[in-house]
């Protein structure tokens, strides 16, 4: 087998990716490990992360600002798709993986690397997402997955890293695995592996507890154009600002926590904790606006598309042909999704209290009203019902005779 000399490693500064650096050099004999750190709005000092990679043995460490691309190319399409895996999880972590993989491949091309690598474990979802995305964009590139091969527990990985002077970022007593980006936080491992164990309050940072949230509600309005959120409370914002503002508003009122049993790609169930206040809020508002601007049959069919879209993204097929086709359908439905939605935030809840679309509303008050202004032709109902239920009536008549 050809000796690999230069590898690009997706790097986060966590246990697994930090340990990957000396492991690749000592176990694989790779001379140059170039790390790539993705700035996804995680609010971390990435210069410190970059320096940690160098201190851990990386020959070079690159930081890429992907925040705008992450929101515009990944988060906003997910909002249009009302993407909720298992009707709960808005894919905050899953959406980041194909973007990171895309940049890994691009950097590998630029520096003539022999391979790309990541620190995903052998029973997580991210290994699938990274590998599938890399294979789609750089099918000629070799993928190295040390954490999938070394068969070390998290505690053993920490000890391995300490031999090379790599400090552990987590407590050995309760080693939570936490992933953070602008869209939210995912927390797993430690005491959370007991599905009956309540998640401790100290693992949350984006959302207030119900007890500590404001005692008075706050009403907000979210404005959409072509299915994209463009403003909050009549203030038009950039896509990144939209997510930031939604995070702050929803999180302050304790909305956006998810505690779920998740069906992983590899076939096991896992307990996951998520904080995604802004993304959940925007999806809720978007779905509500669709209820007044889309035809019933479009809403019904789009619901099936949304479920499949979420599954594909969760399972790693962001760059697959079916996902691309579903994108085209979803996009075609969004030209009329224009308007605003009013939501009341209070004690962990986001309650829709109003919705309107000035030019695209299919709701007509003169048809829906029960007042004297009603223009609905009630006399047509009898004939409609007769035709609508005719097949059922014929079936009932036939079967009642058969029973006799």
Swiss-Prot record:
L-citrulline binds at residues 89, 125, 129, 177, 186, 262, 274. Pathway: Amino-acid biosynthesis; L-arginine biosynthesis; L-arginine from L-ornithine and carbamoyl phosphate: step 2/3. Keywords: Amino-acid biosynthesis, Arginine biosynthesis, ATP-binding, Cytoplasm, Ligase, Nucleotide-binding. ATP binds at residues 10-18, 38, 119. Its EC number is 6.3.4.5. L-aspartate binds at residues 121, 125-126. Homotetramer. This is Argininosuccinate synthase. It comes from Prochlorococcus marinus (strain AS9601).
């Amino acid at each position: 087998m050809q000796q690999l000399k230069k590898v690009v490693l997706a790097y986060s500064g966590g246990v697994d990716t930090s340990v990957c650096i000396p492991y690749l050099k000592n176990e694989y004999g790779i001379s140059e490990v170039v790390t790539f750190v993705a700035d996804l709005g995680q609010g971390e000092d990435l210069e410190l992360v970059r320096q940690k990679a160098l201190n851990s043995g990386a020959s070079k460490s690159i930081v890429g600002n992907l925040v705008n691309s992450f929101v515009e190319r990944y988060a906003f399409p997910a909002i249009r798709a009302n993407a909720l895996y298992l009707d709960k999880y808005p894919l905050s972590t899953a959406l980041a993986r194909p973007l990171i993989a895309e940049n890994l491949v691009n950097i590998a091309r630029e520096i003539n690397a022999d391979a790309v690598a990541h620190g995903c474990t052998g029973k997580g979802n991210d290994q699938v997402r990274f590998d599938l995305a890399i294979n789609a964009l750089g099918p000629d590139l070799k993928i190295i997955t040390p954490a999938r091969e070394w068969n070390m527990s998290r505690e053993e990985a920490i000890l391995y890293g300490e031999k090379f002077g790599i400090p552990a970022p987590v407590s050995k007593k309760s080693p939570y695995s936490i992933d953070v980006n602008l869209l939210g936080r995912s927390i797993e491992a430690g005491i959370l592996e007991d599905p009956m164990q309540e998640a401790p309050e100290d693992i949350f940072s984006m959302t207030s507890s119900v007890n500590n949230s404001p005692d008075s509600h706050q009403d907000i309005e979210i404005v959409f154009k072509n299915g994209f959120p463009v403003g909050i409370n009549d203030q038009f914002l950039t896509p990144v600002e939209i997510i930031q503002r939604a995070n702050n508003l929803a999180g302050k009122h304790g909305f956006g926590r998810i505690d779920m049993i998740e069906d992983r790609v590899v076939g096991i169930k896992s307990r996951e904790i998520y904080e995604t206040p802004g993304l959940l809020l925007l999806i809720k508002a978007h779905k509500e606006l669709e209820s007044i601007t889309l035809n019933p049959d479009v809403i019904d069919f789009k619901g099936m598309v949304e479920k499949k879209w979420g599954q594909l993204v969760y399972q790693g097929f962001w760059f697959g042909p079916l996902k691309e086709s579903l994108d085209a359908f979803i996009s075609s439905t969004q030209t009329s999704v224009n308007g605003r939605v009013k939501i009341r935030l209070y004690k962990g809840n986001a309650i829709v209290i109003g919705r309107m679309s000035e030019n695209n509303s299919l709701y007509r008050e003169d048809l829906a009203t029960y007042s004297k202004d009603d223009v609905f032709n009630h006399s047509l109902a009898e004939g409609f019902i007769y035709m609508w239920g005719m097949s059922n009536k014929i079936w009932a008549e036939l079967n009642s005779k058969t029973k006799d």
